[in-house]
Amino acid sequence: RGQEDAEAFGRSTDCFSRNGELAASCTESLSRLTDEDAYGLQNLIFDTPAKVRYFAWVYPLTLLAVATLLAAPFYPLSLLLFMAIFAVNLYIHYSNKLNVSLYGSAVKQLSLALRTARELAVEEVPGTEEATGQIRQVAEVERRSRVVGTQGDSANELAAIAWLFIELAKVAFNIEVILFQRFIGSITARRDAIHGMFRFIGETDAAISVARLRSETQTCRPQFVDGKYLKAEQVVHPLIDGCVPNTLVLDGTGLLLTGSNMSGKTT
């Protein structure tokens, strides 16, 4: 699909070349992904999903915790069993805390990327029709990701107290572990959609960059033909001034250009 992709990319570039306001609006949306942390998004696409430790015990322990609390008014000694279950759940909770925190940055970037993709889709940039379904699927993943990386606000005492009780509830009933397992499952199921949205944003960014480059320098566009044939007339490097123009014709043959570093191969 190399030729088809190149032609589609050319049409996208033309769209932004003709509409400077659209390019400026999209550039503003894309600017929220300029931080280096944005690279963390690719971890959700290409890395092997983390495995929740001791997950086979999570649901039975959660049911036991609920049962012992319900029985406590009638059998107070059941609170001792609840404390034992709480200790086990505490170990499971913090055994998985590292995995949860490792996904924190990637999840933040997923939310930013989803917001950016939605804004690009509203502008109806090239590729929007295909990306719409992918954006909808990623939104489902993003909703399940909100538990990941949630931390207390130590700067606010009231918020810290509230967070402490929330954290205790998460531990007692394995809430964070269960939600994290569902989040990992949604990533695995929607990985292609995340990748598609990632490409949609990247291709839009690249098309805007190429459109800007074409407006600032002298460039040309290839015309594809069948067969092994290449003809280039008066070719110069687009980013280096003072290059000697070269004409090249290859018909059914190849060309190997050699030379040491900084010897002028690109010019």
Residues covered by each model-derived region:
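Alpha-helical coupling/stalk and coiled-coil linker elements that connect catalytic or binding modules
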Residues: 1-263, 267
